[in-house]
Amino acid sequence: MKKLKSLALMALALLPTSKALAQTNAQVLYDFGTDRKYVTLTLEMFKQDKWGSTYFFVDHDFNYDKMDPNSDNVSLGGTYTEISRALNFWKDSSLKNWSLHAEYNGGITKNYPINNAWLFGVEYLIHDATYKNTLNLDVLYKTIRKKDQNVPMQLTAVWTCNDLFGVKGLKFDGFADFWWETHATFDGDGQAKTRHTVFITEPQLWYNVG
């Protein structure tokens, strides 16, 4: 999964497909993390319709050489995907900012799988009058195949701020995920530790030169 310290180098395409209600883009990102330092290609799509919205992204990490110290082949070493559906049949009611949410996560790397996960819950949208600035908050039940979880939940925030500080074309967006999953980590001296929670965030700053 994408992590903090990723720099968006290039947005390859922005393809509106339905009167600004849908968009697809490709991003090339370089991760400056001390244990990472590789390129990720992200394919992303968001589409609204009368019943809600659909979102997915696929990350391709070009880190084969990082996973195999005996190889200098800078090729695909891992793929991760998320796809989610928000359902909202009550857009004309006082509950219009609330939606039902269903999501799938999973992936594979050269050395290990990223176990399938299913998420179900609710999301709440906060926005200004123009929808240029939005904040989406999710509370989700999360079950991860063959993984121990003290609490089967995930909390997610996704934000977008357009024309930041009044600068036209300057955008600040990103996400933050927090969930419970028992996993091993390694400290600076190589000692393994067991942790029970995961926090991932990826803020991005964009400037549209078009």
Residue map of PLM features:
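Short loop/turn motifs that connect adjacent beta-strands in outer-membrane beta-barrel proteins
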Residues: 20-23, 51-53, 88-99, 127-135, ...
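Cleavable N-terminal export/targeting peptides
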Residues: 1-23
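Residues that define the transmembrane beta-barrel architecture of outer-membrane proteins
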Residues: 22, 37-41, 75-81, 114-120, ...
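Short glycine/proline- and aromatic-enriched beta-strand/turn motifs that initiate or cap beta-hairpins
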Residues: 22-66
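Gram-negative (and chloroplast) outer-membrane scaffold detector with strong preference
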Residues: 82-141
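Transmembrane beta-strands of outer-membrane beta-barrel pores
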Residues: 28-34, 60-64, 102-110, 126, ...
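Outer-membrane beta-barrel transmembrane domain signature
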Residues: 144-210
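Residues on the lipid-exposed face of transmembrane beta-strands in outer-membrane beta-barrel proteins
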Residues: 43-47, 83-89, 120-126, 139, ...
